[in-house]
Amino acid sequence: MKFATLAGKFLIAVPSLADPFFERTVLYLCAHNEDGALGLVINQPLDTTMSQMAGYLELDWQRPGVDRVYMGGPVSPEQGFVLFEQALDLPGIMMLPDDLYMGTNPDIIRLMGRAGAQERFLFALGYAGWEAGQLEHELQENSWLVCDAQRSILFDMGYAQRWEAAIRSMGIDPALLVDASHGFAN
């Protein structure tokens, strides 16, 4: 039987998800295979900015308006991950579904920090990881909704609107999602 990957999809936390870290989160699933899965939370901003990160890494950041850093997940929170749209000729770049790319190379930050660089990218610290079969088990428990990732939600929309927008992209009114422990979501 062929494995059905969910790479390139959004995982949306349902209101009843018990883990407080993932409450009302949207994750972009970067990799998913028989060995497990890796995703980045795209709607939990940190107080740290790209300007601060670049200063710490002794890099020049020339884009003060493009500054948000996200908490990508609880695993390896010291590791930076960049999601972006245009291929870069650097080592360690991973091609994702739908012509998106991810990398951890600090040179990506150097390139993204230049004036005139790629407009749409997302920088996250840490990632969410699942061992083999763990995500599938959580899906069977209805902990997550799954939908096609949309670049407009990933790159253009404000972080506070992403959870609701991802749910609405499935044709679901978020107010109608039932939280098993507290009744309706709102």
UniProtKB/Swiss-Prot annotation:
GO cellular component: cytosol
InterPro entries (UniProt xref): AlgH-like (IPR003774)
Classification of source organism: Bacteria, Pseudomonadati, Pseudomonadota, Alphaproteobacteria, Magnetococcales
Domain of life: Bacteria
Family membership noted in the UniProt record: Belongs to the UPF0301 (AlgH) family.
Protein name: UPF0301 protein Mmc1_0726
